[in-house]
Amino acid sequence: MNHLEGSAEVEVADEAPGGEVNESVEADLEHPEVEEEQQPSPPPPAGHAPEDHRAHPAPPPPPPPQEEEEERGECLARSASTESGFHNHTDTAEGDVLAAARDGYEAERAQDADDESAYAVQYRPEAEEYTEQAEAEHAEAAQRRALPNHLHFHSLEHEEAMNAAYSGYVYTHRLFHRAEDEPYAEPYADYGGLQEHVYEEIGDAPELEARDGLRLYERERDEAAAYRQEALGARLHHYDERSDGESDSPEKEAEFAPYPRMDSYEQEEDIDQIVAEVKQSMSSQSLDKAAEDMPEAEQDLERAPTPGGGHPDSPGLPAPAGQQQRVVGTPGGSEVGQRYSKEKRDAISLAIKDIKEAIEEVKTRTIRSPYTPDEPKEPIWVMRQDISPTRDCDDQRPVDGDSPSPGSSSPLGAESSITPLHPGDPTEASTNKESRKSLASFPTYVEVPGPCDPEDLIDGIIFAANYLGSTQLLSDKTPSKNVRMMQAQEAVSRIKTAQKLAKSRKKAPEGESQPMTEVDLFISTQRIKVLNADTQEPMMDHPLRTISYIADIGNIVVLMARRRMPRSNSQENVEASHPSQDAKRQYKMICHVFESEDAQLIAQSIGQAFSVAYQEFLRANGINPEDLSQKEYSDLLNTQDMYNDDLIHFSKSENCKDVFIEKQKGEILGVVIVESGWGSILPTVIIANMMHGGPAEKSGKLNIGDQIMSINGTSLVGLPLSTCQSIIKGLKNQSRVKLNIVRCPPVTTVLIRRPDLRYQLGFSVQNGIICSLMRGGIAERGGVRVGHRIIEINGQSVVATPHEKIVHILSNAVGEIHMKTMPAAMYRLLTAQEQPVYI
């Protein structure tokens, strides 16, 4: 690379005056500490020629012993720095702040191909583990700006000595480099594969004592390792803190950019970066152990230079293929190195596995690796495409705009009109991602009444029709069905009038004089389109959600679509301050009139399309349509005995009779009445108690529990309790009273059939008393009545049972549920909890 053939001064001189670290990829990644320390100083003049150390063959004066030892350590550290810079460039994700320099980097590599073996770096003692060590230093190069001053591996005053010893380097690179059109792959996915590095010895470099250099390097590395361990723990804690509630708000998710910037690299590191640091720490510990255990002879062999590899008179000879990975091929050294390498790799792999598991536990799904590609945007309604329970959800049709997929079975002119999400809307994206996972687990479709197959309605169906014309009407927001039908009839009347005027060559009203045209009426769960039968060009296109009403009148079909009228700003301000004005808002209705022999089928198909679209909506939101199937619930209701055979009981003549009560004038009847309870088939009053020795009791014709239908010809059915009491009190001056009653036991028997827990019972209980009831549910069908106290459930008395236990019994009861109830007021009277008030 051209700009790396010189010394460090060349790289500093090439920087922008502002100190921006973006002039050169290698300058940014290989010498961050040089750039940081050079920033305060003024830049050199533009015409300043950088020094070329190769132009001065005289070696530099020997430094003092202590400086010489530091210099040797810095040289070894330079080896690590250059390698980490190389990997920092190759591992940069697409779209990163350094990606702009990539083309220049490729061009420089191509130009320097001829000088590939002219320069090299000295072989490091840990060459056996070089591959893993270099990748681990990826993190170190980016973090050295944040290291304390005493932890910097080399300072600015040592740059000249280092550059005198190392004037350049050449790599043969195959690491994670891919073309634009190649599929994405994680940078470390093929770790351990073929990695070629060409090393040559620099002949005129000063002789270094490898043992002293290794000792210095190990001491500095231990200090850096301790710092990295602290940073690693802080980052793990940072992940844990960011994990709590991240998916709750889009604002928090927006804080975490997909690709980290270099100035915030330490705060947004991903799992691979942390694992790389653990690799380096483990590798360093393994190297220490290896250095202590290996004999001196083997260490000397490992540190020996490559024979014949770098003499000045043969700079163009590349290293042999067998020496690209190992410089010394001594059998003894190879076996020892392989043994230590295998032990180290086993330990590292176990540690990496533990670290990844720990990180995954504290990391939420919103924390992504910077190398992970952006997920594709998903539609608001995830339209199902041939999904079976065994098929994976990832086989969904991709969002391609409005064009159908090539393999779609949609008819000619059909569109898949899928509305894409707003870009950058993580909340809807997170919600739809979860709904997609649940789609395939649901059955294909719940049966929807209609003439079409639900699958066909998703793709779209076509009916042939004649387009008669269109007209406009003003309508309220939610008119009744009768009003809708009147509007449809008015639209048909207008169109027929316009046709008659056109035939008589008279001027028709503007917008209504349209000739009859043969069209194809396209119907799907997304939209309704009117296509020209000859050209298949769309004449009209309405989203299904805008269709307000469909009517078939003979062979005429009226399709009404809603459009909001434009309003002035003053109207909008009034409606904003008075929300009740929204109900009075006028809507412009576009009424299209068609003529077809299949008018009824067209209307039914559009209605069925709404039902299928609703099922799609449920599926997209993770709800099984079977749970809300109206047909299934209707079938369940049909299995219930209506009011537990109350109709049969009330219709039997022997249970309904007239009773005459004789009494003295001024004497009360001597009864206590209560309401039969809302939910009974005939709401009236029930005799709850009778006065001892009173006219009612002495007659022997009345019993507790009898329902009074009428008194002296006045019906009590449906009247309030207070009104019924007033009527009975008015009998005080009469000597003979006629009552029409229905014999009923004081205790009501309830039978509820509940096949599955997913069906709610449809009533609520408070302290054993039924306080509310869902109209039309299985409980009402079974005879449950509001105001009744539950006496028994499935043969078990619950009179003295706590409320919580009663609720638990009812919530978990399935199959046939038998209950016995009575009016709560009657229960209190019979148990002497209340004193009766006779009338």
UniProtKB/Swiss-Prot annotation:
Low complexity composition-biased segments: 401-417
Domain of life: Eukaryota
PID domain boundaries: 459-645
Region feature (LIN-2/CASK binding): 375-438
Keywords: Cytoplasm, Golgi apparatus, Nucleus, Phosphoprotein, Protein transport, Repeat, Transport
Effect annotated for changing residue 633 to E: Enhanced APP binding and amyloid-beta production
Compartment annotation: Cytoplasm; Cytoplasm, Perinuclear region; Nucleus
Ranges where the record places region Disordered: 1-118, 235-346, 362-437
CDD domains: Mint1_CID, PDZ1_APBA1_3-like, PDZ2_APBA1_3-like, PTB_X11
Positions of the UniProt region annotated as Autoinhibitory helix linker: 628-643
Tissue: Brain. Detected in the cerebellum, hippocampus, olfactory system, piriform and entorhinal cortex, supraoptic nucleus of the hypothalamus, substantia nigra, and other mesencephalic areas.
Composition bias, Acidic residues: 23-38
Role summary: Putative function in synaptic vesicle exocytosis by binding to Munc18-1, an essential component of the synaptic vesicle exocytotic machinery. May modulate processing of the amyloid-beta precursor protein (APP) and hence formation of APP-beta.
Protein name: Amyloid-beta A4 precursor protein-binding family A member 1
Organism whose genome encodes this protein: Rattus norvegicus
